Amino acid sequence: MAPPSAPLLLRAVGEAGPTRKRGRRPRALKFVDVAVYFSSEEWGCLQPAQRTLYRDVMRETYGLLGALGCAGPKPALISWLERNTDDWEPAALDPQEYRRWVTFQRKTRSKQKTEEKDVFPPKEAPRKGKRGRKPSKPRLIPRQTSGGPICPDCGCTFPDHLALESHKCAQNLKKPYPCPDCGRRFSYPSLLVSHRRAHSGECPYVCDQCGKRFSQRKNLSQHQVIHTGEKPYHCPDCGRCFRRSRSLANHRTTHTGEKPHQCPSCGRRFAYPSLLAIHQRTHTGEKPYTCLECSRRFRQRTALVIHQRIHTGEKPYPCPDCERRFSSSSRLVSHRRVHSGERPYACENCEARFSQRSTLLQHQLLHTGEKPYPCPDCGRAFRRSGSLAIHRSTHTEEKLHACDDCGRRFAYPSLLASHRRVHSGERPYACDLCSKRFAQWSHLSQHQLLHTGEKPFPCLECGRCFRQRWSLAVHKCCPNTPNGSPRPLIGGPSQRSSAL
């Protein structure tokens, strides 16, 4: 005989409870209404873990009834369970109690059949006089229930909290193996072992082509498709191909626009429950993925994988234009805009365009005047965290990196590397339009504004824009005269001509 399934071990009260009739006093709930009885054959098919869980569920249910004042005399089933024996004892069960339970189950099944007729109406007989036409099928619209507690896992509604707790116990029977780190439950120990690698960071499966490691064998199989170039999943709407079925499912929501899963905290909607679960960690602050090297925690596993490449030095994404390598595909996409000249992010205030969203956000601080990074030593504020870090070195006077040619010292290796190009004459940054070369990336960026005509530094008082920050600073010190012409600088050409 096959082992009984988890729903056979326990049935929720919301599915088996008697329906209250109008005008009658509700009957008190009894233990026989929620208890589950097994025959000797069924009991013999249960695993030891299922028997232990069955004892705990029945005792907990009897305790809940006692808290509600509905326990009554101790049933024979509870007395038998308290003896904690694995042997089936038919004499330990009250035959009258067992017969009442069987009668109750028969009434429940007849009640469920009646409800199914209400939810799914019978097919209508074909109308006379219309030969050759089949009758239209009735729409199957399930009846909605409301007013009771809802299970957060499956969304089922129950008449009371006792029924909900019984339902949760049944779900625990289906998945008896909980994760000690996050509480998630699984049906088999192998699934639990595979899941716990997400917390520990263990990756036992290695790709033979590139050496990349994975925590699950299926993830390795999906990764190997990258080397073969195979994309077996096609979108029927636009023909785009994907390597994973999940990627195709996520893509198809762009055509339908359906987002049925809503965040209860902020109202944001998502196409899949997994995306909603990841989003809700921003509200709860949960970071279940820990780096074993530095103990830093992350909300998403992908963020942990990208972070671990800092320790391993792995950069699996090469740029086909300059052979520079990156640790994530998103950084590669952002870098390739340097070669293509694409600037998809536009400023709404001055029409300046940028290749990265982070650069646009930093630029918008020029319009708002906001400087969110204050120095804790002197109170001076900066728009960028990097500028604050460089400024704080002026307080500590800690400059560990010295130039071998002139002895000048710098606070960061990047500043020293940029300075040493003055002595070597190296100019690694070339303009794609005129082939002019520069020693620093910032100088190339300023030069490219001559070709694009972009002026990203606006004056907040008059709205005039400038290509360079120092030009804006000079403009603020020497604003325009009332007639609109620029006020001449001290020692400028206008003063020298008037002196002549």
From Swiss-Prot:
Biased composition (Basic residues): 128-137
Disordered: annotated span: 105-144
Top-level division of the source organism's lineage: Eukaryota
Record-stated family: Belongs to the krueppel C2H2-type zinc-finger protein family.
Cross-link Glycyl lysine isopeptide (Lys-Gly) (interchain with G-Cter in SUMO2) placement: K455
Compositional bias ranges of the Basic and acidic residues kind: 112-127
GO annotation, biological process: regulation of DNA-templated transcription; skeletal muscle cell differentiation
Subcellular location: Nucleus
Coiled-coil regions listed in the entry: none
Gene3D superfamilies, per database record: 6.10.140.140, Classic Zinc Finger
InterPro entries: KRAB (IPR001909), KRAB_dom_sf (IPR036051), Snail/Krueppel_Znf (IPR050527), Znf_C2H2_sf (IPR036236), Znf_C2H2_type (IPR013087)
PROSITE patterns, per database record: KRAB, ZINC_FINGER_C2H2_1, ZINC_FINGER_C2H2_2
Organism of provenance: Mus musculus (Mouse)
GO MF, one annotated term: zinc ion binding
Region forming the signal peptide: none
Protein known as: Zinc finger protein 689
Presence of the UniProt keyword Oxidoreductase in the record: no
Zinc finger (C2H2-type): 149-171, 177-199, 205-227, 233-255, 261-283, 289-311, 317-339, 345-367, 373-395, 401-423, 429-451, 457-483
